[in-house]
């Protein structure tokens, strides 16, 4: 069994990563933008910016899945140098896709890519392989990425409007319940809501914390001293409202 397979089977953030756009917990305006690309049958060159764990990489992968595109993902915080472009990316981008469509290169955490070498070189790659390949870049800090890259990509900012936060937090509460039920971990709903609100909208952090606390076999008030006291009545109330609404439909 490969390291990648072990990671997907063990880490909850990978095991329960949404595989399609509809299952991503994001504002509808963002999901609609990606759905339009699926309908057109082709991705654009994209620069996705926003806070850690908010769903940028997840929806990029979901887009590739729905387009049935051949893709590779490179984490630039670990592999953000010019040699990566000259070897891995060039070899991938220059070959023909098995499916016949365009290939996609996902460059995760691209704000860690070297701004003096890799970033300027990528500008040329985007143009050189435009007939065969698209590039999706994710970043936490878009100001660390040179302007010529911005101008060659469609920039999508992952901002959550205040009016959407209760709905998304509630949706993630329900998602966490499914995860815990699947893993046979007991939980106190209020404690679960407190953990979500503490780290919202960093969904990756929330799942990682849940997995860490789950070692004890249950998510209950025993972890409150680590989480801190947070008023979460409105998120639990919102979740009950949504479930009630679904039952009426």
Regions found by a protein language model. Give the residues of each.
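Loop-to-helix "switch" segment enriched in basic
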Residues: 216-242
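C-terminal helical "lid" of AAA+/P-loop NTPase domains
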Residues: 193-198, 204-216
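Short loop-to-helix capping motifs
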Residues: 27, 201-202
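A short, ordered amphipathic alpha-helix with a cationic face
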Residues: 10, 164-167, 180-183, 224-229, ...
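Short conserved motifs of the RecA-like P-loop NTPase core
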Residues: 186-199, 219-223
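P-loop/Walker A NTP-binding region and its immediately flanking N-terminal helices
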Residues: 1-164, 170-171, 194, 208-211, ...
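Helix-loop-helix "sensor" segment of P-loop NTPases
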Residues: 166-193
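Short polybasic/polar patches that bind polyanions
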Residues: 65, 181, 197
């Amino acid at each position: 069994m490969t390291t990648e397979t072990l990671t997907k089977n063990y880490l909850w953030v990978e095991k329960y990563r949404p595989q399609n756009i509809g299952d991503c917990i994001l504002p509808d305006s963002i999901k609609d933008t990606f759905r339009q690309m699926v309908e057109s049958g082709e991705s654009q060159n994209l620069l996705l910016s926003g806070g850690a764990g908010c769903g940028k990489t997840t929806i990029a992968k979901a887009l590739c899945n729905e387009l049935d595109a051949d893709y590779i993902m490179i984490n630039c915080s670990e592999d953000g140098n010019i040699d990566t472009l000259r070897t891995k990316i060039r070899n991938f981008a220059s070959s023909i896709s098995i499916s016949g469509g365009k290939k996609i290169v996902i460059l995760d955490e691209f704000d860690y890519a070297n701004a003096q070498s890799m970033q300027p070189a990528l500008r040329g790659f985007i143009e050189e392989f435009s007939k065969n390949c698209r590039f999706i870049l994710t970043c936490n800090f878009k100001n660390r990425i040179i302007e010529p890259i911005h101008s060659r990509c469609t920039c999508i900012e992952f901002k959550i409007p205040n009016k959407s936060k209760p709905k998304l937090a509630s949706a993630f509460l329900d998602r966490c319940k499914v995860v815990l039920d699947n893993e046979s971990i007991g939980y106190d709903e209020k404690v679960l809501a407190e953990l979500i609100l503490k780290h919202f909208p960093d969904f990756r952090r929330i799942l990682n914390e849940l997995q860490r606390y789950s070692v004890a076999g249950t998510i209950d008030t025993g972890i409150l001293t680590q989480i801190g006291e947070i008023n979460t009545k409105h998120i639990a109330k919102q979740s009950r409202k949504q479930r009630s609404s679904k039952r009426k439909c």
